[in-house]
């Protein structure tokens, strides 16, 4: 272990999903690389839920608490059901992911996790990066992987995905929404956001994740989303005679925006900040796992980290999609509904997960309002003209 003013091989700034995933891979491979993770939080709790379609096996597969081969959308009393036998939609427990990563890392003599510490500034020289910490210490690292959340403001056409959710156990008679399948989007047509929807996952024993989500140009106020979540529960659960016990809660704001340029020659951006999050959906966990595998392999072979894979065409399509959603002559929830209703499910899953095959594009876009997309593309066709 080397810290203070002594040189290390790799500093990982931010020990959330991406930072822990990379460090756990290195520890599992018995890497001798000297690694320090710098994380502001003092400890880990069940603070979030990671979900998405599992396209390949991954390191944390045994941390899922539920998975489904079928899912649903709901709009104006209609229900749309879709399925994939190839790609299950899985829900992962944050505490299980954290515990597995921390156990794996603790078995390494060359990896140190510094909790309750922040990196305040850095200076890059020819052969190293010097990092100042808020505890007065310094790290000198050959390479840096920066996974900390982006701080920059976002501009049109980019959006915020804001959400407030609870995991609750119902008590009483069966309510109208109680199903064994995940409800990915229950559109709330009377809400002020560009798109508002309920996201509901059944986790067993009449326990559910209830999440109120909004896509909008500005961060939504948490108290407003909380109010709408409670109103929804009152309409659909309380009126059916149910009470519920809140087990935990989660909230967040995801920037649905183009990623920043690479940090520098010796600083690699990773996680959502580096491009692992799909702009148009917010899904990130499984892409982070793919990156962690690839980055760990490169570090073990060459001693040098790499960032997430970039797909400029997908980024362009995401920008075009978000621009169309914000047209005054478009009903965004109708576009989202058509996307799921008209697309071949496996192709759509690969597309939404950021891993489309060449033959997936047409099965995905054929059901969308072509005239709106063509008109929007004609004005904004230069690849990704807008500012990050």
Task: List the model feature ranges, each with a label.
Residues 293-388:
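C-terminal helical "tail/cap" subdomain of flavin- and related membrane-associated enzymes
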Residues 25-78:
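N-terminal FAD cofactor-binding segment of flavoenzymes
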Residues 15, 148-149, 271:
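Glycine-rich, N-terminal phosphate-binding loop of Rossmann-like dinucleotide-binding domains
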Residues 91-114, 236:
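Helical element adjacent to the flavin cofactor pocket in flavoenzyme catalytic cores
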